[in-house]
Amino acid sequence: SDVCSSDLEDRYDFVRDILIRYKDLKRIYGYKIKDYWRNIASVDDYYSTNMDFLKADVRNYFFKQYPDVYSKVDDLPPAKYNPGSQVRNSLVSSGCIINGVVENSVIFKKSYIGNNCVIKNSIILNDVYIGDNTHIENCIVESRDTIRANSYFVGEGEVKIVVERNERYVI
């Protein structure tokens, strides 16, 4: 089964629920930022922010100005692109294996994209297995998920959240 983003919108927003609520009760200070900044207050904001990193100017701002990103060390091999795979305008993390077509997408670490798959305008979170002949477009696939072969998920008008808990594969 899958969950649509509208089901997840009932979360707290820092600006709406904290800053605006307490602006007359507390002393709140801020300053104008000229550089890149996004308030991630919804699933759509999360999606848009990740997609922004596919733009060269945003990517260069972060990775050239701040080249050292400290994170959990996994000691993973670089991504592997098997014969027949095609990747265009995408970010693919370490430990991934790509067998299909990935376009305008962000693929997090340790994800597997099967043969004859098409992934477009999507975010595939870490440790996801996507079976052969699968089409995913305008979606966010949840971490540690397994998408069965021959699946079809397309977000129409809004980002679709794909959550499938199937049998696990180890990469």
Please report, for each region that a protein language model flagged, where it lies by residue:
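Short, small-residue-biased leader/transition segments that mark boundaries at the very start
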Residues: 1-5
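Left-handed beta-helix
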Residues: 8-171
